[in-house]
Amino acid sequence: DQPVERHAENKRHLIPAVMRAMTMNADRRVQCCRIEFCDEDCGCCYH
């Protein structure tokens, strides 16, 4: 178990999480957010 091998495996598992976060951020720009999570990245609905 070499340090380089561990780093490559850790990085491989990180990439799906990063992709999910990026997808969530993109979705928030076009969808309504829950009011407690409202910020500049999402279009908030106040109805």
From Swiss-Prot:
GO terms for molecular function: toxin activity. The keyword Secreted applies. Residues 1-31, 46-47 form a propeptide. One of its GO terms (cellular component) is extracellular region. It comes from the Eukaryota. It is found in: Secreted. The keyword Membrane does not apply. Expressed by the venom duct. Disulfide bonds join C32-C44, C33-C42, C38-C45. Keywords: Disulfide bond, Secreted, Toxin. Belongs to the conotoxin M superfamily. The cysteine framework is III (CC-C-C-CC). This is Conotoxin reg3.11. It comes from Conus regius (Crown cone).
